[in-house]
């Protein structure tokens, strides 16, 4: 694990510990997503998917989320559509063997450094929104 932290994977895929259980964390995230006019287009239950294929893993749910003001700017232009493979944004909620719940996401702001100005601006804006959603959802009451 220290080797992963040392090689920078956590700067590409930031991880936050949740003080809530997995289902509560998912529900808090969905509430924040919807309150900010984002949409949950799909929830992937990777534990159930793996179980269908004979693998037993700890719970993992991935929220696929989108906001048309961000995605529309990319999808309206032919040149930018190439990054649609990274869409929609994803937030992963999972348990680890320590029994705690964690939230991870991709850091598109890092990738935006090699993008054209419009794509970089959109990616940075979406990343900021997603980070606000996560931080707000993980706040303890």
Predicted feature residues:
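Terminal, regulation- and interaction-focused segments at domain boundaries
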Residues: 1-40
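Short glycine-enriched loop/turn motifs at secondary-structure junctions
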Residues: 8-10, 34, 55-58, 96
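Short beta-strand element of the conserved SAM-dependent methyltransferase core
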Residues: 14-16, 63-66, 93
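Compact, glycine-rich, soluble single-domain proteins
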Residues: 36, 42-49, 53-89
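Short intrinsically disordered coil segments
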Residues: 78-81, 106, 120-121
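Short secondary-structure transition/capping segments
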Residues: 84-97, 134-141
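Beta-strand/loop substructures that line and gate deep hydrophobic ligand-binding cavities in soluble
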Residues: 90-116
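Well-ordered alpha/beta subsegment
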Residues: 114-141
């Amino acid at each position: 694990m220290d080797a992963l932290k040392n090689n920078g994977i956590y700067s590409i895929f930031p991880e936050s510990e949740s003080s809530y259980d997995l289902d509560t964390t998912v529900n808090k995230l969905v509430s924040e997503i919807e309150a900010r006019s984002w949409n949950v287009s799909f929830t992937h239950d990777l534990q159930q998917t793996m179980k269908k294929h004979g693998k037993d893993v700890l719970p993992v749910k991935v929220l696929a989320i989108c906001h048309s003001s961000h995605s529309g700017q990319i999808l309206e232009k032919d040149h930018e559509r190439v990054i649609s493979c990274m869409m929609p944004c994803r937030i992963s909620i999972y348990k680890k063997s320590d029994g705690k719940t964690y939230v991870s996401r991709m850091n598109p702001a890092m990738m935006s450094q090699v993008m054209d100005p419009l794509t970089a601006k959109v990616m940075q804006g979406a990343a900021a929104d997603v980070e606000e959603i996560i931080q707000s959802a993980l706040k303890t009451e």
